[in-house]
Structures are given as structure tokens and as C-alpha cells.
Amino acid sequence: LANNLGNLLSRVATAVGKKCDGVGPRPRPDSPLAAAAIEALEETTARWGDVQPSRALEATWQLIRATNAYLENNEPWKAEPGPLVDAVMGDALEALRIVAILASPAVPTTAQAVWERIGLDGLVADQRLPHAAAWGGYPGGVAVTKGEPLFPRRQV
């Protein structure tokens, strides 16, 4: 599961760096990812409320998988910079913002690292469900940084 989040963050940050001059675009209000984000928010919130952290994380990781599939379908790395790439990358950044909020209770340090790399200020732990994780909160116009791997591979 960790690889999925780390790979998603790396892919998005790399594409934003190359195709959007390192500045995160705003998400689309009518993004195809919005439905997956709403579903993840509802399920994750319910599972945290039931004190089922593993199921809460599984619901959060569904959004990561949906975002990876969305990127595979749209292939922004193959497109020329412009409105399509901006839309796809804005949507992916919004999904990462929501993932950071939803995962924060279980993996606070990782969630904060995602939060900062996608250009957001403050503490992800200060965000309150469900309102903070509603679709459309990513501001756009902020610097996105790739940084070191989120989960470095260990040599054994």
C-alpha cells in the first residue's frame, strides 16, 4: 500500500514539474475523480467512527488506486502542457490532498509530507472531517515539490 501512495505522489509531482512549471493547477469541480473522493470520504469517515483503522485506510487507498487509474487513462506525461494537463494534474493534486487528510490519523508523518509536497501550508492534522476533505479544496497556484522518495527502499 505504501508504494501506491509514494508512486502516486512522485508521478504527480514529476508531471507538475515538467508540464505545469512546478505549480499545481486547481481541480475541476466536475472531475471524474470527485465521485471516488466522495465515496472514499464517506467510507473512511464511517470506518474511523467505528474505530476500524484498517478498513478506514483501505477506503482511503481506494482513492489512491482510482487516481492512479485516472492518470493511466489520461497519460498527462505524454500530452503537451495546456488545459488538459492542467485539469488532470489539478484533479490528481486534489485527490492527494484528500488522501493526506483521510490517512492522517494513521500515518501522520507521511500525511504531513504529502501535504507539504503538494504545496499546502499548516498541519494536515488540523483539518477536520468531513468538511476539510470535500472535493475542491486544493487552491492551485502553489509550488509542488517532488522531494526524496516518500518510502525509501531499504537495502537488506
Task: For the regions a language model picked out, list residue spans one by one.
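Long, charged, mostly alpha-helical binding arms that flank functional sites
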Residues: 1-84
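Basic, alpha-helical terminal appendages of large translation-related enzymes
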Residues: 46, 51, 61-156
